[in-house]
Structures are given as C-alpha cells and as structure tokens.
Amino acid sequence: MQLPDTFTQRMQRLLGSGYESFLEALQQTPPTSVRLNPGKTAAKPGLPKVPWAEQGYYLRERPSFTLDPLLHAGTYYVQEASSMFIEQALKQVIDLEKPLHVLDLCGAPGGKSTHLASLISPDSLQVSNEVIKSRAYVLAENVAKWGSGNVLVTNNDPRDFGRLKSFFDVMVVDAPCSGEGMFRKDLQAIGEWSEENVNLCAQRQQRILTDVWEALKPGGVLIYSTCTWNEQENEENIAWLSEQEQAETLKLILRPEWGITPTHLNGVEGYRFYPHLTQGEGFFMAVVRKGGIPEEEAIGKKKKYKLTLAGKKEQALVENWLQNPEQFVWLQHGEVISALPAPLFDAADKVFQNLYVLFAGAEIAEVNGKKLKPLQGLALSQHLNKAAFETADLNLEQALRYLRKEDISLGTNGSNWLLLQYKNIPLGWAKQVGNRMNNYYPKEWRIRMELPQELPSFTLLTA
C-alpha cells in the first residue's frame, strides 16, 4: 500500500509513536460487522458485540450476504462498526422517549438512517435525504426493507432544507469527505486522495453545514461525522461552525476498552477511530448543540394539505392489514394507499410542501376498483398483521429463487395472495393462479448474481 507523502507526514504528527501500529493495521483485513433490526428479530447471535451499539455484532469472516434471504428481508444491515457510534451520541445527549423531528442529510445507502429509525420513538418523524437521485432510490429501498414506517425519503440539495426553518430537533450530517478512513477497504480512495481534494471537501462540508443550519431548532443537536482523519475536514470545520454560529460541542462518556480517541482542538470535542486502536474503520464524529431556546411553534391558519387521505371505502379494505390500524393515518396517491403514524401527519405534510419526497411511511396496497394488490412495503413493514394473510415458508433455495424473481412452485392450488417467508420473516408476495404462482418481488430489487451449485450454510440468525 503506497500512501501519499503529505498524508503520511500528517498521520505521523497526529499519532506519534502509534504511527507504526497504525500502518500495520492498514495492511490487515477490515472487520465485518452487522446491526440487527429489533423491530424484526429479538435474536441474540453468539457473536462478539460491537460495544457501543446494542444491536451491533462482529462476524468472524465476511460471507456472501447476497445469499442470505434475511438480509433482503431487512432483518439486519451490514454496517461498519465505527459508524454505529452515532448510537452513543443519541443516547447520551437526547431524550429518545420524546417525539422528535430527525434529519439524516446524507443518507444513502442507509446505514445511519436504519440505525436512527431503530433508536427514535415510533411517534418521531425521520427525514432521510440523498442529493443524488440514483442513490436516493437505494436509500428508499433500504428504508422500506427496515420497515419502521415513520421515515420519509427525500431527494434534495442541502440548501432546500432552509425552507424548513427550526424544524429538526436532531440532524445527522455524515458529510462527503476525502475518505482517508477507507484506505484499507478501498485502494481506489488512495489514488483519488490529494491535498487539493481535502481542501475542496472541507469547503463543500462548510457549505452543507451553512445550508442546513437554519433548519435545526435552537437547542437542537447536530451530529457531524466523516470517514477521514485530517483536522481540516473535522475539528477545524466544527471550530469554524462554532465561530460562525452560536454553537458548542458536547462531551460524550467513553469506556477505555472501546479504544476511541477523544480530541480537543480549538475548543472542539471530537472522537476519532483509528484501526490500530478500535475494531472498525477510520471515522470522526463531533456532537454540536445549537445555541438559543426552542420557540413554541406558532399555530397559524392551516394551509391546504398536500397529502390526500384515502377514502373510507379504500381504508376499510386494507386497515386490518396492519397491527393497531387506529394508530395510522391512511394516505392515497393515485392508486397507491400508504400508512403513516397518525401523530406525524402535520409534520409530514410540511415536508411534502417543501421538499421532493420519494417515499413515505409504508406503501400498503394498490387499489383498482375492488381489486387490491398488497405492496412490498407492507410485506416488510414492522407493523404488518400477518394473521390477515395466508403464509408460506420457503427453504433457502426457494427463497433465493424467489428473490431472483424466478418462478417457484410450492405444490399448492388456489387464487389467494401468499405472504412468502424465510425462517418466519416475510420476504414478499406471490399470487396463486391455479397451480401456478406469480412472483411479485420488485424487479429492481432482485438478486442478479447466479446462484452457486452448492448454497452456503451461512445465516446470521438460526431461527
């Protein structure tokens, strides 16, 4: 691994006597870690824990995750362990029992968004944003698979959030960066690194922070992170923000065995993850509280709603498909009926009024007259009422062929919608037509790789 000279000199200055151990760690295989979805499984795998994340686990080796149906079912997410430290920021600084408005600004592919969704209360509204459209669709897919039902996925530039003044209690900005912390995982990142790129990244990060700052409530919390080590993109940017705005960094409690390195530069409290000290990739995080006192939201004359409620007839057709249907508001856009926790309606409508929303809540059904088609979002929802449907459990080969959108046969006969499951966790829908079965797995989500002749024995959860 040939590292750039200026990068090497800076890391020697930052790490001192620890530099040789750092270099050695860069030659080692990165650890593989996953985070379970507590809304879908209560399993506790017999695996080493990620100590700062309740649902985080290290795997002994990296399997072919594509060949585990439970990944596609949203039962867990493959996430780098260092970035799970966001959990400590939320738990130590924020009252997670309260209803909150939370923004994940740079959300794709969905690691932090799905993590946030597991930590906040069900009556909190989360907005997960991605500026690049193709990546925003990937984010929406992963949010749908997670199935929490209280997330809106948007496709906006950070400056657009200025329209939502003092709207968010919590903002997560995992800023685009020079990627120094990914060097051992992605050798291409080394080739793309330069001092000029570091400068450009730092300037872009400042623009992003400036663009979204007005949308954070006074007293609200910003969690800022990068996967890089230089001070310019990290502590110096937060010091710059503190000078520009009324803001202070917050100190978190660390356990020595975690191996996380606290930093104190220009009055900024930061947290660094180095691979020779912490079991994870390179990462930086700082937690910032915005100055001022939260204002009571003014109650003015309500503008016309942008969201459209489903009619009573349409609602009656689908409401028993969710557990506790009275807790939801039922929305209709064209032929699609969606569900959103009822307390979130006004806040969600405000987001719809001001941003470009790709995905909201849980998509339940497509209605055409009296014909109903259950949608993939319902199958993967944590609020699905499985008792409303006929279910069929698939073995590993059947599940993977279903996820490849191949025809499968279960030897059944009828004309019902079937909820297909693997290890009792829903994967999606099929429609029986006599002794034939139509596969309704979304084409754009299908597994594209060819299945090996011998399927792997790996599965993260045994039951």
Question: What is the meaning of each model-derived region?
Answer:
Residues M1-L14, G18-T41, G291-A463:
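Polybasic, low-complexity RNA-engagement segments
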Residues F168, V221-Y224, T228-A339, P343:
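Class I S-adenosyl-L-methionine
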